[in-house]
């Protein structure tokens, strides 16, 4: 049995702005709804009374899709959205049949709006009805900017670009409030700043105490390669992993993104953060990185 957990989604408009598919379909849905409403008002004498309920329900569905995308809550509400979309599609297609053959300009406008709404509903059913395993779903997601990056929240953006950065509360518990923590890792020979900079492959270093590298030391490190023993003595702040998850599907990390990790189907991962689309996880071999949340399930 999966252990229930509570997660209060946060509204992030950047999630919508960074997703071209969601932004374009929601925008077209609103435009289609306005056209359908205006045409239906103009052809009210020929418009069936039940059609008004269909328009109201379609507006509710568009609002639901907007909120689900903006709060990054697609997975828990996927089945609900599919049920709503099936009903809304039945309503708008039925209204299309009632107005498209009347011949007046208002009826034609209403029919065009309902046809556009039907197309948008079909696209949403295809997207929300499939998972990342489906090629078309993965292709659509590939256009999303920075894997859930929020453009209007700097703190959220820092978290997404570097899930290993320390929060202020963690820094205070270490006695270094507000101070950036730096470290260098095995075989890399450089200095990685864990305060919001891109990881660049430094995520799999060993555990040690935090320390702030001096400029002279940093310059020296750029001129020589760190040995495994040096990496063992390097300074790094460990992250807690209170959750455990099982891989539902196998995942191959993107070679262009050093932050991702690969894992096999059925593998057990330790997870530190379950918010957002990408979770920080640790494998049994100690490898640390981010994994897509829809590829794993939380364990009791």
UniProtKB/Swiss-Prot annotation:
Q: Which GO terms describe its molecular function?
A: actin filament binding
Q: Which Pfam families match?
A: SH3_1
Example GO biological process term? regulation of actin filament polymerization
Q: What Gene Ontology cellular component terms go with this record?
A: cortical actin cytoskeleton; plasma membrane; site of polarized growth
State where the protein is found.
Cell membrane
- Source domain of life is Eukaryota
Q: Which residues lie on this side of the membrane: Cytoplasmic?
A: 1-20, 71-79, 130-300
Give the record's membrane topology.
Answer: Multi-pass membrane protein
What's in the keyword line of the UniProt record? Cell membrane, Glycoprotein, Membrane, SH3 domain, Stress response, Transmembrane, Transmembrane helix
Under PANTHER family, the record lists: FCH AND DOUBLE SH3 DOMAINS PROTEIN (PTHR15735), HIGH OSMOLARITY SIGNALING PROTEIN SHO1 (PTHR15735:SF20)
> What is the annotated role of this protein in its UniProt record?
Plasma membrane osmosensor that activates the high osmolarity glycerol (HOG) MAPK signaling pathway in response to high osmolarity.
Identification of the protein by name: High osmolarity signaling protein SHO1
User: Which species expresses this protein natively?
Assistant: Yarrowia lipolytica (strain CLIB 122 / E 150) (Yeast)
Q: Which gene encodes it?
A: SHO1
